[in-house]
Amino acid sequence: MPLLDSFTVDHTRMEAPAVRVAKTMQTPKGDTITVFDLRFTAPNKDILSEKGIHTLEHLYAGFMRNHLNGSGVEIIDISPMGCRTGFYMSLIGTPAEQAVADAWVSSMEDVLKVEAQNKIPELNEYQCGTYEMHSLDEAKAIATTVLASGISVNKNDELALSDSMLKELSNH
């Protein structure tokens, strides 16, 4: 099985909340697709609550588009990580990490402005696979933590696992 890019970085040294360029790739037509690791919590130390991350999934994707799309950037998708420590964001373009962090801050501020659970977009059985598994309060708690902590930048070269470490880990 091929080693995925996300498993070549040392998760024990990741800062959170933090932005990281997880991958860039070129389409056959020459567009650049950038995948960002938007790490909300430190791996293996904390996780986002089930209802909180689900509510953020509904809110964050729209808010990030409001703040980041434009001038050569178009978000394709924002999806929660299976480990529940953050989100992956795929987009067309190459925005600077600080621009992504700024949009993230603005999006968390937007989350705090949502007035009631019934204001969560697509919160119904027709548009959501588990529409009863939401908590605006938990999403707001996550947003408050992110805003209080500040958002840093994780760099791949600083987090890269050595070839010898990758080989050792593949033997386990």
Curated annotation (Swiss-Prot):
The keyword Oxidoreductase is assigned to this record: no
Swiss-Prot/TrEMBL cofactor(s): Fe cation
Pfam families: LuxS
Domain of life of the organism encoding this protein: Bacteria
InterPro entries the record matches: LuxS_sf, Metalloenz_LuxS/M16, S-ribosylhomocysteinase
Protein residues bound to Fe cation: H54, H58, C128
Catalyzed reactions: S-(5-deoxy-D-ribos-5-yl)-L-homocysteine = (S)-4,5-dihydroxypentane-2,3-dione + L-homocysteine
CC cofactor note: Binds 1 Fe cation per subunit.
GO biological process terms held by the UniProt record: quorum sensing
Any one Gene Ontology molecular-function term assigned to this protein's record: iron ion binding
Keywords assigned: Autoinducer synthesis, Iron, Lyase, Metal-binding, Quorum sensing
HAMAP family: LuxS
Family stated for the protein in its record: Belongs to the LuxS family.
Role description: Involved in the synthesis of autoinducer 2 (AI-2) which is secreted by bacteria and is used to communicate both the cell density and the metabolic potential of the environment. The regulation of gene expression in response to changes in cell density is called quorum sensing. Catalyzes the transformation of S-ribosylhomocysteine (RHC) to homocysteine (HC) and 4,5-dihydroxy-2,3-pentadione (DPD).
Protein's UniProt name: S-ribosylhomocysteine lyase
Originating species: Aliivibrio fischeri (strain MJ11)
High-level lineage: Bacteria, Pseudomonadati, Pseudomonadota, Gammaproteobacteria, Vibrionales
